[in-house]
Amino acid sequence: MFPRAHAAAYVMMAYRIAWFKVHQPMAFYSAYFGIRAPAFDANLMCKGDGLVMEKTRQLQGQEKRTAVEEDMLTTLEVAHEFYRRGYRFTPVDIYKSAVDQFLILDNQTLAPSLTSLPGLGEAAARNIVEEREKGKFMSTEDMLLRCPKVTKGVVETLTAAGALNDIPKTNQIDLFEMLSGS
């Protein structure tokens, strides 16, 4: 028999989760995506509900799914709900995103964690956060010098996600660009 105390604990936990989902939705989604959604892929989920639904349909159309795909499907369903409620994600940003937490930027916006990018591990993310606190990166070259745990593959991942758009590739100044008035 299932003890009543366990049943009561499960009911209390379900009630608390439901309360947060209704009354503090951004806190709920921040915690859910940061803790309960290991399959969160910022490259996919931060690009809008249309892409989320397309991937959901693709996974639902498969007869057999792996455990990773099942986790992805659950995460996609919660992301779809997130978008339907009028919320949005910002792109991953090396200056704003935390290592492994989703940050609440305002009542409508979550900033995904650095580790939500596939291929960007916790050690590299921590290294980036530690170094950004010491000062801005002058270039991706500077990032590679200052962050020994960041590889060229991580830089490619960040570049593909648009997280390095405002940072030049090298520390060298282009004389022609400087003279043309940029």
Segments from the language model and where they lie:
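Noncatalytic, beta-rich nucleic-acid-contacting surfaces in large DNA/RNA-processing enzymes
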Residues: 1-182
